[in-house]
Amino acid sequence: MKQELKENQGLPASLLWTLAIIAGISVANLYYNQPLLNRISRDLQTSEFTANLIAMITQIGYAIGLLFIIPLGDLFKRKTIILINFTVLVVSLLTIALTPYIHLILFTSLLTGICSVMPQIFIPIAAQFSTPETKGKNVGMIVSGLLTGILASRVVSGIIGEYLGWRFIFFVAAGMMVICVIIIMRVLPDIPCNFKGRYSDLMKSLFSLVMEYPQLRISSLRAGIAFGSFLALWTSLAFKMEQALFLRETTL
């Protein structure tokens, strides 16, 4: 049931839990492919390099979404943006599950990354509508859901890929996103946009913040380097661990 939200007046516990869970389900789409790259490479008869591009392009899509999609939350109704992105996610995940063509998988992996950024809209919702006393706790809960999705996705993907094939996890992911669409339609109220202007003005304001605050530039650079190093290690390590240690997807 939809509940009216008022700024700084509190966020219903049911809605908070819903957003935290959906945040984890949504961001998990970025990582399902990582333990399965070797299996995908063998099944599609492509090189390890090309298979690794799947994980890389997915993360590039995520970066594009953070830069160009998330700001739309200030320009349009957030519920509409969430529903559109989740719908595109369903189509992208089903395409990955069904297509035999690696180039189409690469393209839909890019779309998957772009549209998996919606948890970054949930976090401002929690901050905006929570009371001052619960703001930090509620934002932390959404972030916890997000991190749980990141960690659990690899485990679930490896197990399902080992016993049911690598395509099955993407069918499961698409089904979960359909459920998320239905839940968002039912429980998330319309939140009016709070920016009056054009998209170009909105993007200019983002870049002006980067130019104005050196701490923001340093923090962004550090986070980018750390996250890039993490992904560079773990996306390529799956191939080497399976080859050298003969580990299966469930272990990876």
What do these predicted ranges mean?
Residues K2-Q9, P189-S220:
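Juxtamembrane intracellular "pre-TM" segments in multi-pass secondary transporters
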Residues P12-Y32, L110, Y213-A232:
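Pair of pore-lining "gating" transmembrane helices in MFS-fold secondary transporters
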Residues W17-E48, P119, L233-A238:
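Extracytoplasmic
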Residues Y31, Q59-L67, V117, I150-L151:
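Residue-level signature of mid-helix packing/kink "hotspots" within the transmembrane helices
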Residues I40-S41, L72-G73, A152, V156-L164, ...:
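Interfacial helix-cap and linker-helix signal at transmembrane-aqueous boundaries
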Residues I64-I102:
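Conserved MFS/SLC helix-loop-helix module at the cytosolic interface between two early adjacent transmembrane helices
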Residues L104, M141-R186:
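Helix-loop-helix hairpin linking two adjacent transmembrane segments in secondary transporters
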Residues T108-S144:
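Cytoplasmic helix-loop-helix junction between adjacent transmembrane helices
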